[in-house]
Curated annotation (Swiss-Prot):
Keywords: ATP-binding, GTP-binding, Nucleotide-binding. Displays ATPase and GTPase activities. The lineage of its organism: Bacteria, Bacillati, Bacillota, Clostridia, Eubacteriales. One of its GO terms (molecular function) is ATP binding. SUPFAM superfamilies: P-loop containing nucleoside triphosphate hydrolases. Coiled coil: none annotated. It holds the Pfam family PapZ_C. The keyword Nucleotide-binding applies. This is Nucleotide-binding protein NT01CX_1284. ATP binds at G8, L9, S10, G11, A12, G13, K14, S15.
């Protein structure tokens, strides 16, 4: 089990760090009182491997509970619960700027000067910082750069290589464009098998429709161009820290052309080793509604 304790200065990026760990599959808990760490770790270890990655945020917001941190870390060590500490730091100047922009009050300076609260927190956390396994100074980092750093430290090789999840979704424009789509492609320019009586009953999951739709020159050219575009976009999305990409392909009813193209794109992405899923949102909508309204 990998047990990460995330701590550090207020405003240094702990929230972004815990979100990044959550994206890596860690079971995350924010602001857990240190007095509960032992019981929490024990409960996780008793899941027989169902929970194998844990991340806890423990910071100065815990008030007097924070003073019990070292005693509880000692208890974890005595019980052979292996843990590592990630400490988020930033310069006073950057922390002041971030607090001014967010218009939040510092937990140790609710009624006093911000810089005094930062200095007090830095002194109180000095010993924790000394014990940290990893220290990340976020002073000159963007959120994406911090996420990248977290992924490199706490993600495994497979996660780093295949961190982008691609969802290929077919849909019918008559039923609305998917609200979560990142890329939308309209394939209504392709010949429509709906108007071929002997094909109308089938869907893009059937060979009859696939042979018809994929048999046209325009279809082959479109798939090749879309494949080439995704080949360019995917590594750039990964570079920017994107973890999910929804590629939506639409035709009129979402049963024939869009399903066929979505299947073809899904197969190509799968062959290239991408982490990809597919969904045909509206494939049965026309049938459920008793036929298509023109």
């Amino acid at each position: 089990m990998r047990f990460v304790i995330v701590t550090g200065l207020s405003g240094a990026g702990k929230s972004q760090a815990i979100r990044s760990l959550e994206d890596l599959g860690y079971f995350c808990v924010d602001n857990l009182p240190p007095t509960l760490m032992g019981k929490f770790a024990e409960a996780c270890y008793q899941t027989d491997g169902k929970i194998d990655k844990i991340a806890l945020v423990i910071d100065i917001r815990g008030g007097e509970f924070f003073d019990d941190l070292f005693e509880n870390l000692k208890y974890l060590k005595e019980q052979n619960y292996r843990y590592e500490i990630l400490f988020l730091d930033a310069s006073d100047k950057v922390l002041v700027k971030r607090y001014k922009e967010s218009r939040r009050t510092h937990p140790l300076a609710p009624g006093g000067r911000l810089i005094q609260g930062i200095e007090l927190e830095r002194r109180r956390l000095n010993e924790v910082k000394y014990k940290a396994n990893n220290i990340i100074d976020t002073s000159n980092m963007t959120q994406m750069q911090l996420r990248e750093k977290i992924w490199r430290i706490y993600g495994d090789d497979e996660q780093i290589e295949n961190r982008l999840i691609i969802d290929v979704l077919s849909f019918g424009f008559k039923y609305g464009i998917p609200v979560d789509a990142d890329l939308v492609f309209d394939v209504r320019f392709l010949p429509n098998p709906y108007y071929i009586p002997e094909l109308k009953q089938f869907s893009g999951d059937d060979k009859e429709i696939q042979d018809y739709v994929l048999g046209f020159k325009e279809t082959k050219e479109f798939i090749a161009k879309l494949d080439d575009m995704l080949k360019f976009l995917i590594p750039n999305y990964i570079k920017e820290g994107k973890i999910q990409l929804v590629v939506a392909i639409g035709c009129t009813g979402g049963r024939h052309r869009s399903v066929t193209i979505a299947n073809a794109i899904y197969d190509r992405l799968k062959e290239k080793g991408h982490k990809v899923s597919k969904e045909h949102r509206d494939i049965n909508e026309d049938i459920k509604k008793g036929g298509r309204k023109l």
